[in-house]
């Protein structure tokens, strides 16, 4: 089992692509409770590295299928991020929300 810092260090080394971000989100979601994942995502979103914010967005997208606070954070905070990669991850997050909520 990788620690959060190991997952984050791996993610920060890769500049392109989404697979490693989604893999990191999956690892975190398997290790921690949904409540812990939500708090972690909020902290990760404050990080200056766009990769960390992408990871936060991926986690929040998975949580937002059933968590209205995560959905609101995506709509109100993530949507204002200026990095296009974070916006791409936001689009994927909303795809997941729509798939699970039936919208």
Regions found by a protein language model. Give the residues of each.
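Flexible loop/turn segments at the boundaries of HEAT repeats in alpha-solenoid HEAT proteins
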Residues: 29-37, 63-73, 96-103
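Hydrophobic face of amphipathic alpha-helices that form TPR/SEL1-like repeat modules
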Residues: 59, 91-93
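Short inter-helical turns and helix N-cap capping residues of alpha-solenoid HEAT/ARM repeat scaffolds
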Residues: 48-49, 81-83
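N-terminal alpha-helical scaffold/docking segments in eukaryotic complex subunits
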Residues: 1-63
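Alpha-solenoid HEAT/ARM repeat scaffold
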Residues: 22-23, 54, 84-91
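Buried hydrophobic core positions in alpha-solenoid tandem helical repeats
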Residues: 40-42, 73-76
């Amino acid at each position: 089992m990788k620690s959060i810092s190991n997952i984050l260090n791996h993610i920060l080394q890769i500049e392109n692509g989404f697979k490693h971000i989604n893999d990191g989100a999956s690892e975190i979601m398997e290790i921690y409770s949904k409540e812990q994942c939500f708090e972690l995502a909020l902290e990760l979103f404050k990080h200056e590295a766009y990769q960390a914010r992408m990871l936060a967005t991926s986690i929040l997208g998975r949580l937002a299928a059933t968590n209205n606070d995560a959905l609101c954070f995506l709509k109100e905070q993530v949507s204002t991020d200026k990095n296009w990669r974070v916006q791409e991850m936001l689009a994927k997050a909303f795809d997941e929300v729509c798939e699970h909520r039936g919208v």
